[in-house]
Amino acid sequence: MTVGWLTMIPYISGGLGLVSWGMLSDRMNERRWNLLAACVVSAIGLVIAGLTIGTWWAMVGLSIATFGFYGSKGPFWSMPPMFMTGTAAAASIAWINSIGNLGGFFGPWYVGVIKDWTDSYAGGLYGLAFLCVISAVVCALFLDIPNPAGTGQKARPDAAADVAAAD
């Protein structure tokens, strides 16, 4: 029973991150930099967890990482409709889900392999933190959110609804 209560702590943090970061991203009308910041927060949390394995600070690190992981979902999933519409948007979302499912398999496998090699979870957590940093760099350097319908304005969070209404 204690394990269940302890496991709940990072996910409460994640739920708070999901709601609060999504609201912040909508209020700022900004996706890329919110996604980048969430990736950095996740990386910091994973490094803290890796440095403090076996202590309560590891739970704090995992909670920070989960806050960032779940906080990235709102900005991330609002982006595909800004780039594509109709069947192209559906196909891109399906492709993203397929890659995510592969990550759901290979992520735990990778952490387990690193734990077997090093006798510690720290290496696996550092590797996942490195992937979060790579995600942040890709966001900063390569992600350019297009203008909706070439209006010269920055993309709005409700741009997908406008396009759907026009179809």
Residue positions per predicted region:
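Paired intracellular helix-loop junctions of major facilitator superfamily
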Residues: 29, 80-90, 119
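Loop-to-transmembrane helix entry/capping segments in MFS-fold secondary transporters
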Residues: 1, 86-96
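Transmembrane alpha-helical segments of major facilitator superfamily
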Residues: 6-14, 100
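Intrinsic disorder in cytosolic terminal tails and internal cytosolic loops
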Residues: 143-167
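Helix-to-loop junctions at the C-terminal end of transmembrane segments
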Residues: 17-30
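Symmetry-related core transmembrane helices of the 12-TM Major Facilitator Superfamily/SLC fold
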Residues: 123-141
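Interfacial helix-cap and linker-helix signal at transmembrane-aqueous boundaries
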Residues: 24-26, 110-119
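C-terminal transmembrane helical hairpin of 12-TM major facilitator-type secondary transporters
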Residues: 29-79
